[in-house]
A protein has these predicted regions:
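C-terminal and inter-domain tail/linker signature
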Residues: 1-182
Length: 182
């Protein structure tokens, strides 16, 4: 998880993501029980004001649950499917104060990436060159996409396995803005 102040409206947010695991011993949301371990990938956004939760957003990968049950509502995914790992070095929890200049530099990079992608949406170009993403992404980046898309390694494979099919296959897409930006 991580927390911080949103640059959109100066509100405080706590965010977590991961996998819930349980035994699917009963039918759930119309999905048949499989009596096996079942994993639900999620991301949870919570706005806190005066010590109370005032707004939340919860996103979960129900298509991933369906895949575990042998139900495939979408065409075959183009990327790999597996339980995505945590940080590569497994030292993602930072308990000591960090260099604010490094945080500022990282935030500027993420915001530049978001702006590049927003500009791309406005342009209508569904097949941008790899050099566009290389402005803010490392060549050996890994995309951990949801079920139906899957994971990809390297910018060219990300574009082949996710970006190009997604952009060309999803017409009339609308960006409604960010819930928060930390």
């Amino acid at each position: 998880f991580f927390a911080g102040t949103s640059e959109i409206d100066n509100t405080d947010w706590v965010i977590s993501m991961g996998h819930f695991m349980g035994l699917l011993d009963s039918n759930w949301l119309g999905f048949p029980a499989n009596r096996k371990m079942t994993f639900l990938r999620y991301a949870d956004f919570n706005c806190i004001r005066n010590g109370k939760l005032v707004r939340s957003g919860f996103f979960c990968d129900l298509i991933g649950v369906m895949h575990q049950l042998g139900i495939h509502p979408l065409p075959p995914q183009t990327g790999a499917s597996f339980i995505y790992p945590g940080p590569r070095t497994h030292d993602g929890i930072l308990l000591a104060p960090q260099d604010p200049s490094e945080s500022t530099k990282t935030l500027k990079l993420v915001n530049r990436m978001c702006q590049d992608l927003e500009d791309l949406n406005v342009s209508g170009d569904d097949y941008p060159p790899p050099s566009l993403l290389a402005k803010t992404w490392c060549e050996d980046m890994i995309w951990y996409g949801p079920a139906g898309i899957g994971a990809s390694y390297t910018i060219p494979r990300y574009q082949e396995q996710h970006q190009y099919p997604f952009r060309s296959g999803l017409k009339d897409k609308v960006f409604n803005g960010h819930l928060c930006r930390l």
